[in-house]
Amino acid sequence: MTQRVERNYLEITSVKDLKENNLLTLNCSITLLEPENFQINKFFYKIVGKKHNWTDRLSWSESQWIQYSSDEKVKTYILKVEEDLAGYYELIFYNEKSEVEIAYLGLVENYHNQKLGSYLLSSAIKNSFTNNITKRVWVHTCSLDHKNALNNYLKRGMKIFKKEVIEI
């Protein structure tokens, strides 16, 4: 049985276009995961993606996770509330194209509906532009993602540049 899924591709071409959300009442921090730790990437991929049909990496071997997470193009950032792991994002830097892909971004379910998604996305966009090479940050989201995902991208200043319908 196939399912019809709407996919939107969005981009932002200047950090000046970011409509940032950095007003939080929770004690939280976002930090670059150093050193790389494939177990953290795998943990978030599974726990965040479970409700949103993220399946492409479920069959990855440990060596595939290690290879991916240790790739110099990939940067993983972790959101903590107090000391709890609350969310993450993965950025892939394509310096030869002067662009960054927000490959994955999401929150652990306990931290939904607290404005943390907009805070996390604001951080992802800002960190994408810190290298003075990036001219474009892009992401894709689909109708299986969190119900507020597309609206969050649009509210942060991203623009849709492509739409498609796929069958999965």
Predicted region positions:
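Conserved catalytic-core motifs of GNAT/GCN5-like acyltransferases
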Residues: 5-10, 140, 159-168
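Acyl-donor-binding surface of acyltransferase catalytic domains
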Residues: 1-29, 34
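Conserved GNAT acetyl-CoA-binding A-motif
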Residues: 129-141
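Short acidic/polar active-site loop segments enriched in Thr and Asp
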Residues: 75, 135, 159
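Short amphipathic alpha-helix that is part of the acyltransferase structural core
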Residues: 22-57
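Conserved beta-strand-loop-alpha-helix junction that forms the acyl-donor binding cleft
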Residues: 112, 138-149, 166-168
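A conserved beta-strand-loop-helix scaffold within acyl/acetyltransferase catalytic domains
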Residues: 60, 69-76, 80-99, 103-106
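Conserved acetyl-CoA-binding loop-helix of GNAT-fold acetyltransferases
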Residues: 104-107, 113-128, 151-155
